[in-house]
Amino acid sequence: MDSAAPREPGATEPPARARPRLVFRTQLAHGSPTGRIEGFTNVRELYAKIAEAFGIAPTEILFCTLNSHKVDMQKLLGGQIGLEDFIFAHVRGETKEVEVTKTEDALGLTITDNGAGYAFIKRIKEGSIINRIEAVCVGDSIEAINDHSIVGCRHYEVAKMLRELPKSQPFTLRLVQPRRAFDMIGQRSRSSKCPVEAKVSSGRETLRLRSGGAATVEEAPSDVEAAAARRVDDLLESYMGIRDPELAAAVVETARSSAGAQAFARGLDAVLGEFAFPDEFVVEVWAAIGEAHDACG
């Protein structure tokens, strides 16, 4: 039996429980004191907060990793941050130029971007044209193609530009590598252990950053959603030469609210029309998401 006294007519509601402050620890990946940041809702605001904490310009930050100072593309910060995650900011280091001759259709690059204007190399395919150029490394930001600045371009735009470059004609890439700590110098894609390595959170709650509107605390994606997003990310790489876990998650979210393949195609066009996904990609994605759900039961 409910023993609570009935509320008198006109009585005010009890005050809402205060939302806890979400404070995140951060360091510069090449080495710095630990800073603390809060009050951001998207990646650009996050970069501004990190820059303010360390007295640098936001445009100095190329990308961030979670719980590791290394240039580890599996630890890239995307649209979700675990509430206990430690944020490492990788800032601009040396600029370098390389000349490339496109002897095959594909260069062997997979591109991603930081959500704040910089596209960078996420993967280099073994045995590819780029793999044979020692100066080009995973984590390098692509600043210009043939002196044409691509700062501000999205990853899919950069990938398209590279695909459309004519074969047998040399071109120049201007790259900016992340500034490296002493123990990381000379490493192409791996680095030795850092004395300060943050603990990885085992919690399921994350802060989800949004390009519009306030950030929200949400449960981490389910195993089914995570598996489906990984398959979509693989297809993004295969069809478009990019990897983008947040875009993949948005595609899965669109599929979840679609009654069938045609509704899914319309939903993608409405929400993510700027990407101009090819029809065969949409068909494969719909099938892959269904297979991921079946595989996970």
From Swiss-Prot:
InterPro entries: GH2_GIPC, GIPC1-3_GH1, GIPC1/2/3, PDZ, PDZ_sf
Alphabetized Gene3D superfamilies for the sequence: 2.30.42.10
Keywords, sorted A to Z: Deafness, Disease variant
Database matches in PROSITE patterns: PDZ
Tissues where this protein is expressed: Expressed in adult lung, brain and testis. In the inner ear, it is expressed in the inner and outer hair cells of the organ of Corti. Also expressed in cochlear spiral ganglion neurons.
Domain PDZ, first and last residues per copy: 97-177
Keyword Transcription found: no
Pfam families: GIPC1_GH1 (PF25083), GIPC1_GH2 (PF25082), PDZ (PF00595)
Known disease link: Defects in GIPC3 underlie the age-related hearing loss 5 (ahl5) and juvenile audiogenic monogenic seizure (jams1) phenotypes. Ahl5 mice show irregular structure of the stereocilia bundle of outer and inner hair cells, late-onset degeneration of the organ of Corti. The spiral ganglion exhibits a severe loss of neurons.
Biological role stated in the UniProt entry: Required for postnatal maturation of the hair bundle and long-term survival of hair cells and spiral ganglion.
Similarity remark: Belongs to the GIPC family.
Protein name: PDZ domain-containing protein GIPC3
